[in-house]
Amino acid sequence: MTRKKRRLYFVVLGMLALFAAAGLTLTAFQDNLVFFYSPTDLQEKGVDQGRRFRVGGLVEEGSVVRDGETVRFIVTDLMNTVTVRYTGMLPDLFREGQGVVAEGAMDGAGTFVAASVLAKHDENYMPPEVAESLKASGKWQHGPPTAAAAPAP
């Protein structure tokens, strides 16, 4: 084999190895990639049943229903809503009128089945995805929560 052919052989082999590594990396990221949707995004775009994603917004007032360890509540972006079902312990800061981000998947009945629920850290914090969604919908209100959203003493 001449030097020229050997060099070409190594270059082609190196390119194949690079493409294989890139393909494996992208496949690994695809499995771990979790997208964020607002309730309006879900209405407009839809998501495949069983596909993992995050949904965020505000917990609608009067929507929290507890049945043993299972909790059902409605997440809204003040334009559309999505019903969420979660089994487990909710964060201490979870309450109606506050921002949440839930991670899980849609079931066949159109309910979002959450594997985890994240709540606001304090009265001034809102998850960035939720804030962007509310700004895009024109419903953004900057400042402290309203009296209805504040926790009971």
Curated annotation (Swiss-Prot):
One of its GO terms (cellular component) is plasma membrane. Heme binds at residues 121, 125. Pfam families: CcmE. Its main location: membrane. Keywords: Cell inner membrane, Cell membrane, Cytochrome c-type biogenesis, Heme, Iron, Membrane, Metal-binding, Signal-anchor, Transmembrane, Transmembrane helix. The chain crosses the membrane at residues 8-28. The keyword Magnesium does not apply. Residues 144-153 have a biased composition (Low complexity). One of its GO terms (molecular function) is metal ion binding. It is a single-pass type II membrane protein. Residues 1-7 are cytoplasmic. Residues 132-153 are annotated as: Disordered. One of its GO terms (biological process) is cytochrome complex assembly. It comes from the Bacteria. InterPro entries: CcmE (IPR004329), CcmE-like_sf (IPR036127), NA-bd_OB-fold (IPR012340). It is found in: Cell inner membrane. Residues 29-153 are periplasmic. HAMAP family: CcmE. PANTHER family: CYTOCHROME C-TYPE BIOGENESIS PROTEIN CCME HOMOLOG, MITOCHONDRIAL (PTHR34128:SF2). Heme chaperone required for the biogenesis of c-type cytochromes. Transiently binds heme delivered by CcmC and transfers the heme to apo-cytochromes in a process facilitated by CcmF and CcmH. Belongs to the CcmE/CycJ family. This is Cytochrome c-type biogenesis protein CcmE. The lineage of its organism: Bacteria, Pseudomonadati, Pseudomonadota, Alphaproteobacteria, Rhodospirillales. The gene is ccmE.
